[in-house]
Amino acid sequence: MKLIIAIINDQDTENVSDHLTQESFRVTCIASTGSFLRSGRSTLLIGTDEIRVPRAIEILRENTNQPKDPNEHKAIVFVVDVKEFIQV
């Protein structure tokens, strides 16, 4: 199992979340602020099987907009191993 941590612009959150959930990804959204430009961000937590990671990243690429500032990225994405997953 993998955990995808995606930091995206606030304006893209609803669109990205909708597309991910349409393909049965479970998404948790946390409001966050970047330290450099201090503008609105959302951090998405997406738990998924390793085989589905490429599709999740593809959805992120397709549904995020290029920021006006050339120093910004559409998204910052981390993919980390999940040692244990428990649902209570």
Walk through the language-model features, giving the residues of each.
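Positively charged, small/polar-rich N-terminal and surface patches that mediate targeting and assembly
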Residues: 1-88
